[in-house]
Structure formats: structure tokens, C-alpha cells
UniProtKB/Swiss-Prot annotation:
Protein name (database record): Proline--tRNA ligase
First-tier enzyme category under EC: ligase
Alphabetized UniProt keyword annotations: Aminoacyl-tRNA synthetase, ATP-binding, Cytoplasm, Ligase, Nucleotide-binding, Protein biosynthesis
Gene source species: Teredinibacter turnerae (strain ATCC 39867 / T7901)
Classification lineage: Bacteria, Pseudomonadati, Pseudomonadota, Gammaproteobacteria, Cellvibrionales
One GO CC annotation: cytosol
């Protein structure tokens, strides 16, 4: 490609509304332009990157045996009502009516569409298993789109759906998809972690997310220092520590006026937050129309409550709901900041770490008073012990190897074992070997294609711009001439190299704009992130050398002009 015939819309200034580095650089490098909140135009440079990611995804999905289909973005309300998600999905589902006042939605996902398709096309267990995928535009009406294409309302996604006669068959395909995703991210050149995850609104049983590790990530990923274990913090198990041995003779009540938070109480009593317990009051489950019972959750003061874990506990309302402060004071006799597991007449669930504490500080269930040197089975008691908290750095890994480390991650892929959540609701059945109707078991597998582009930038950039992994760079090589339109020798050398690269299948950009300054061209090449570049000028040609620099290299090097093409062919991965 010749720069003189190509739109390279770079900018010197960073747009004020761009928050994360990928958003800033995608705008400055001329990859995207904002059209409206959460909606972006992809410019030629950006689209080249997007298509390269898409091609890698397609190639690996085809290798896995999945079959490509294409389903409509606009979906009829009936199939969403049939699955039960028309109301469940909430305002993120953009609902529209056509001229005949028939209800539709813009698809944020395609479980209903594919289930409707396959229940009408597949009739026998002999046709299974089957796995279908598409690379299609999705729309989710995010309440606050941000971070550019990282969290846009419209985005490009690869979604796949598999159908099975048994759980064993689903597990086989699930494992194939796990390996396929690893192959995809390896080929793109990303540092990533597959992690155990929650199934969320999609539903189902087993689930793994694939996270690109980056400081700007929205999710905390817990992983072992000595094994492959990794999980979203919301799902990582916090093991029980060794029980502490009480050393005091008995608890003592202390007046703690106006000390509400753990930090305030700990400082006032000259202890660390780890030596305190906090008691949180939530609503329990109820089967009648009366008020839900109160449930006390007790954690160590320096630990944070894990909403996902707690909402799955027997006896606790789902979704997790904190009790009103007025009700707490009326029924338990103390304000929130002074509560403790002391003589409570309600269910008390202690976290594993809290249950192992001794000589701790806790609320005395008397406003503005706390106990010091309290102990279980003496002053305090609990109904049962559960895992209630988020893991922290240094915790023992639940796999039994190493300790927990935590990094931020950007979710770029997610695989689910759906089971029969959708197939049962939509009566997607096949005849088994005995001629009986059996509900198909399903899996689904998503990759954020456009999000991968932003994630790659978050992981690969410097002060000068983007540093693309070779596999998805818009161009692999930039030829930067000095006075090409004034020197026949420079022009001939540039054109010869350009032709050689095109013949060899190397994506090459010739910076042939007649009025472009050398400094501006080099700055654009670095900003756009082209992995390899050469500078060709009269002086170098006279000496028989060409200047080469890799985007990740600190310094340039001289390469013999006669062997330049062979040098580049070895440098640039096919």
C-alpha cells in the first residue's frame, strides 16, 4: 500500500474524553473515530487490524471443527419471551418495533436464535454433536459506554454454540474450545490467563473467562505463584487458616464513641484491622410474605465480602440484600458500627478466617461500645462457618501450590457449559437411540473480536505509540524514503523493495507522500505501531547500507543494501 493513496489520519493531540491508553492511541493513530456514545467508525488502519484478528479467530475455529453461520442482528421478541430473557435482560436489551408494531430487539447475544434454528433442523442424536459459530455485530445498550471500543454499545464478537446428546459430549467440545481459545490468543501474541468464572446472566454450570493481563483491566484475577491455577477473584476459594490460640483471660468492654469504621475502631484501640471482626447484617431467605429474617455475616476486619459467594449460600437472599439500618437498630439493639457476634438471636455465619481468630475486637451490640480480647465459645458464637470473602495477595492458593497473586485483567473471551437452560425452555429436542425425545445439552463460547484490538494495545505500547504484535499489525513493514521524489536512486531502491515485499506476501506501507517530512513520517510509523521499518536515503545507498529498526528495538542498525530483502524476510514472521 502507498501512503499517498491511503488514509493515515493520525493526530498529535490526545482527545480529552479518552480515558485509557488504548482509547487514546486508537484515536491518535487514526484507527477509529467516535460517531456517538459507544458507537465508532473503523478507519482503514483500524479495520486492517480488526480483520487480522477476525481471520485468526476464523482459522482456529475452523480447525476445531466448528461450522460458520451468520444470524440476524435483529431478533423477534417471541424467542426471547420463550426463553424467559425478554424481561430478565433489562435495559441493556434494545427493544424496537417495526412498522407493523411487532416487537424485536438488537441482539446482544444469539442463544435464542441458534436454539430456534437447530430445533427445526436437527432431529436425531446421530446428527450430534454440532458446533456453530459466527462473527457478527452485537449491540448492548450500556448505561455508560466508556474506554472506546473496550466497552462500546456496538461491537464485533465471535459467538459459538454447541449441541450435544450428553454432558460427556459437551465436556469434550468444551475442552476443545478451551484449547482453541488458547491457540487464538497465542497466535495473536497476547499475555493472557484462562480463569474459573461465574456464569452470570447467560446461565449454565461450568464457565471460564480468558483475560488479557493489563493494569487498566476491570477485573481482578487471582492466580497461583507456583501453578496454572487462576480464577476471577469473585470465585477464588479462600482457604481456612490455622486456628489461633487464645492468650487472654477474658474479654473487656471498651467505650468507642463515634468510631464507626474498622479503621477508626482499630486506630482508637491500637490494634490492626486484622485483629478486628466486622459484622454485616443481610436479609435471609423467606418462603412467605412476611419480612425476611436477618442473617449476620462475620468477617475479619481487613477482608472484603464476596457478594457472589454469599448470594449462593443456603439461607441468604439472592440477590444479596443488606438489611435497613433502622430495622437493625430496632431488632438488634445497636447501630451498625457496634455490632458483633455476641449473643445474637439470629443466624450467624462466620467466614473461615474470622472463625480462626482469637483475642479479637468486635462490636459489643451496644452503640459506641466494643469488646477487646473476645473469643469464640466464650463471648462470641456462630451458627456455621463458610467462605465469605475475597482472596487477598499472599493467601495460600486453593490448588495447594504457592500463594495467591492478583493482577488486573481485561476479559476477551468466555466459555460456558449452558446445559439445558435454553434448550429446555425452547423445547429443543432430538430422538435418542430408543426413539424418545431428549433435550439437547448446550455450550456457548464467545470472543470479543473488537475488544481484542484494544486489549492488545493496553499490553503493547510505549510513549511513542502502539507496538503491535506482528500477527495483527496493520502493516508489517514501513518503507520510509528520504527525498524519494528528488532522487532516482532512492526511488528505485524503494520501488524495488516494495515490489519484492508485495510478491512475498509481506504487508508493506510505502511512505511516498511527496511533501511529508522525515520526522513526521517516522513519528507516524511509531504511533501506528508498524513492527518493522527501513529508512532509505542517498547517503546510505552510497555506502551500500540501509537503516533498519524494529518497533521494540532501542536503536537502529545498518543492513547491507544487497541483502536487505533476505534480512527482512527472516525478521518478518510469515
Amino acid at each position: 500500500m502507498r501512503a499517498s493513496q491511503y488514509l493515515i489520519a493520525t493526530q498529535k493531540e490526545t482527545p480529552a474524553d479518552a480515558e485509557v491508553i488504548s482509547h487514546k492511541l486508537m484515536l491518535r493513530a487514526g484507527l477509529i473515530r467516535k460517531m456517538a456514545s459507544g458507537l465508532y467508525n473503523w478507519l482503514p488502519l483500524g479495520l486492517r487490524v480488526l480483520r487480522k484478528v477476525e481471520n485468526i479467530v476464523r482459522q482456529e475455529m475452523d480447525k476445531s471443527g466448528a461450522q460458520e453461520v451468520l444470524m440476524p442482528v435483529v431478533q423477534p421478541a417471541e424467542i426471547w419471551q420463550e426463553s424467559g430473557r425478554w424481561q430478565q435482560y433489562g435495559p441493556e436489551l434494545l427493544r424496537i418495533n417495526d412498522r407493523h408494531d411487532r416487537a424485536f430487539c438488537l441482539g446482544p447475544t444469539h442463544e435464542e436464535v441458534i436454539t430456534d434454528l437447530i430445533r427445526n433442523e436437527v432431529k436425531s442424536y446421530k446428527q450430534l454433536p454440532l458446533n456453530f459459530y459466527q462473527i457478527q455485530t452485537k449491540f448492548r445498550d450500556e448505561v455508560r459506554p466508556r474506554f472506546g471500543v473496550m466497552r462500546a454499545r456496538e461491537f464485533l464478537m465471535k459467538d459459538a454454540y454447541s449441541f450435544h446428546i450428553s454432558q460427556e459430549s459437551l465436556q469434550e467440545t468444551y475442552d476443545v474450545m478451551h484449547r482453541t481459545y488458547c491457540n487464538i490468543f497465542d497466535r495473536i501474541g497476547l499475555q493472557y490467563r484462562p480463569v474459573l468464572a461465574d456464569t452470570g446472566s447467560i446461565g449454565g454450570s461450568a464457565s471460564h473467562e480468558f483475560h488479557v493481563l493489563a493494569d487498566s483491566g476491570e477485573d481482578d484475577i487471582a492466580f497461583s505463584s507456583d501453578s496454572d491455577f487462576a480464577a476471577n477473584v469473585e470465585l477464588a476459594e479462600a482457604l481456612a487458616p490455622a486456628k489461633q490460640t487464645p492468650g487472654s483471660s477474658g474479654a473487656e468492654e471498651k467505650h468507642t464513641p463515634s468510631q464507626k469504621s474498622i479503621e477508626e475502631v482499630a486506630a482508637f484501640l491500637s490494634v490492626t484491622p486484622a485483629q478486628t471482626l466486622k459484622t454485616l447484617i443481610v436479609l435471609g431467605e423467606t418462603e412467605d410474605e412476611g419480612p425476611a429474617p436477618l442473617v449476620a455475616l462475620v468477617l475479619r476486619g481487613d477482608h472484603s465480602l464476596n457478594d457472589i459467594k454469599v448470594s449462593k449460600l443456603e439461607g441468604v437472599a439472592d440477590p444479596l440484600t443488606f438489611a435497613p439500618e433502622e430495622r437493625i437498630k430496632n431488632e438488634l439493639g445497636a447501630e451498625v458500627g457496634s455490632l458483633g457476634p455476641i449473643g445474637l438471636k439470629i443466624t450467624v455465619i462466620a467466614d473461615r478466617a474470622a472463625a480462626a481468630c482469637a483475642d479479637f475486637v468486635c462490636g459489643a451490640n451496644k452503640t459506641d461500645y466494643h469488646l477487646i480480647n473476645a473469643n469464640w465459645d466464650k463471648e462470641a458464637s456462630y451458627s456455621r462457618v463458610e467462605d465469605l470473602r475475597n482472596v487477598v495477595v499472599g493467601d495460600p492458593s486453593p490448588c495447594g501450590k504457592g500463594t495467591i497473586e492478583i493482577k488486573r485483567g481485561i476479559e476477551v473471551g468466555h466459555i460456558f457449559q449452558l446445559g439445558t437452560k435454553y434448550s429446555a425452555a425452547m423445547k429443543a429436542t432430538v430422538l435418542d437411540e430408543n426413539g424418545k425425545d431428549v433435550t439437547m445439552t448446550m455450550g456457548c463460547y464467545g470472543i470479543g473480536v473488537s475488544r481484542i484490538v484494544a486489549s492488545a494495545i493496553e499490553q503493547n505500547h510505549d510513549d511513542n505509540g502502539i507496538i503491535w504484535p506482528d500477527a495483527i499489525a496493520p502493516f508489517q513493514l514501513a518503507i520510509v524514503p528520504i527525498n524519494m521524489h528528488k532522487s532516482d536512486a532512492v526511488k528505485e531502491a524503494c520501488e524495488t523493495l516494495y515490489d519484492q515485499c508485495q510478491t512475498a506476501g509481506i504487508d508493506v506501507l510505502l511512505m511516498d507522500e511527496p511533501k511529508a517530512r522525515l520526522g513526521a513520517m517516522l513519528a507516524d510509523v511509531e504511533l501506528v505501531g508498524i513492527p518493522h521499518r527501513v529508512v532509505i536515503g542517498d547517503r546510505g545507498l552510497e555506502q551500500g547500507n540501509i537503516e533498519y529498526k524494529g518497533r521494540r528495538d532501542a536503536e537502529s542498525q545498518e543492513v547491507a543494501a544487497a541483502s536487505l530483502f533476505e534480512f527482512l524476510r527472516e525478521k518478518i514472521a510469515p
